[in-house]
Design a protein with these regions (language model features):
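A glycosyltransferase accessory/donor-loop signature
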Residues: 1-14, 18-21, 158, 163-277
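Conserved beta-strand elements of the Class I
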Residues: 6-8, 105, 204, 287-291
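Short, acidic, metal-binding catalytic loop of nucleotide-sugar glycosyltransferases
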Residues: 25-33
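Short internal beta-strands
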Residues: 35-43, 132-134, 314-319
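Active-site-proximal specificity loops/subdomain of glycosyltransferases
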Residues: 55-96
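GT-A fold catalytic core of metal-dependent nucleotide-sugar glycosyltransferases
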Residues: 68-70, 87-138, 153, 162-163
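A short, conserved beta-to-alpha structural element at the edge of catalytic cores
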Residues: 130-150, 234-254, 258, 319-321
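Hydrophobic, well-ordered beta-alpha structural blocks that scaffold small-molecule cofactor pockets
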Residues: 258-367
Length: 367
């Protein structure tokens, strides 16, 4: 008889397609001695329920839950309000919705399985309430941890948690975290901040392979990730995404009922402001250079090349990247200025430095 691993997910209709890819990948890599009981919290339409139910197999069982608070009274940080909504707070309902379950793995839907998660189920959590992985960025920011009232020196990413639901309920973790969020009118990193405050010194830190985030992968700290987390703005379902495990997501999705769905584009408010300034300054078109081949630079290049035919990108500048993107050459510096109307600065944190560098040798307009 197969042992059961309980897994909880919190989604809305927009993320059903990505959850399908995740669940399929979990089942594909799972040991034959186990089965997954997938608990999906979300107010989903009939089409998505039907498609997710089609994932059912010998080692995958699927259940749906929608009887829990909507959490709409809790604000979302301005840092995330263009890509997150109240669904991020649904995880607080897991212990009560799954009142007969004592242990569950919570996994964000923007992840993909590369290996077998079954060994996770046998981890001895000792007295810990959750087992987690350090956040790839905030885990190193001790100053911000202190500001948040976290004295443990550790900060975890809440997109993956092995939860002891018995201890969670006994310690009223959801209630404590929700009270903190309400009393503080939200936090910069929403539920993740609240959980790090409430759970400090009550967590077991695991190897990064269980929640392999971009900086972990960039540093090559992980030889064989089990769960890859596409955290951040750029996702593998974006047409311009560059990620070492993008294909793992696409292959898994292609084997689900969502196989024919197209890839997506995404622009945040800063992207739209940059493009608006470009159009206002050069309404009849322009020859431009894009400075920065990172996520924002790729988004802007894609939008300009595909949807703004009056504007041409002559080349891209990035001191850390070589090659090309969408047929546009990437250089390490300004290589020619003649005929260029403007430079779009996609590396916003370094905008002032870049403007100073451009101003030294040219009179180009900086957007």
């Amino acid at each position: 008889m197969r042992k059961t691993i309980h897994i909880a997910f919190c989604i809305d209709n927009a993320f059903a397609i990505h959850l399908a890819a995740l669940i399929h990948s979990l089942g594909k890599h799972l040991s034959q001695n186990f089965q997954l009981k997938c608990h999906i919290l979300g107010r989903l339409n009939e089409d998505n329920i039907f498609k997710l139910t089609s994932l059912t197999s010998q080692n995958i069982k699927v259940g749906f839950y929608d009887d829990f608070p909507d959490y709409k009274e809790i604000p979302i940080s301005s840092l995330y309000n263009n890509r997150l909504n109240e669904v991020t707070y649904y995880r607080f309902a897991i212990p009560e919705v799954l009142h007969n379950v004592e242990k569950v793995v919570f996994i964000d839907a923007d992840m993909i399985a590369i290996g077998d998660i079954s060994t996770l189920w046998s981890i001895d959590m000792m007295d810990s309430i959750v087992a987690v992985v350090s956040d790839h960025i905030l885990g190193c920011d001790k100053e911000k941890q202190q500001v948040r009232g976290i004295s443990s020196g550790r900060y975890f990413n809440a997109g993956f948690m092995l939860m002891d639901l018995g201890k969670w309920r006994e310690n009223n973790i959801s209630q404590q975290a929700l009270k903190l969020l309400i009393d503080n009118n939200g936090f910069e990193h929403n539920d993740q901040d609240a959980l790090n405050i409430v759970l400090q010194n009550k967590v077991l830190y695991l190897d990064e392979k269980w929640n392999a985030q971009p900086n972990h992968l960039a540093k090559k700290d992980i030889s064989e990730p089990v769960l890859v987390h596409f955290c951040g703005q750029e996702k593998p379902w974006h047409v311009y995404c560059v990620h070492p495990f993008k294909d793992s997501y696409l292959v898994s999705r292609a084997e689900t009922a969502y196989a024919c769905e197209p890839l997506q584009t995404y622009l945040d408010q800063d992207d739209m402001d940059i493009l608006s300034r470009l159009k206002n300054k050069f309404p009849d078109g322009a020859r431009i250079v894009v400075w920065g081949a990172g996520q924002r630079g790729r988004r802007l290049c894609y939008e300009i090349i595909r949807n703004m035919d009056k504007y041409s990108i002559e080349y891209i500048i990035d001191k850390g990247v070589s090659g090309e993107f969408m047929g546009v050459e990437i250089n390490h510096r300004l290589v020619k200025v003649a005929g260029i109307d403007a430079v779009i600065i996609a590396s916003i944190p370094y905008r002032d430095e870049i403007i100073d560098e451009i101003s030294e040798g040219s009179c180009l307009v900086c957007i």
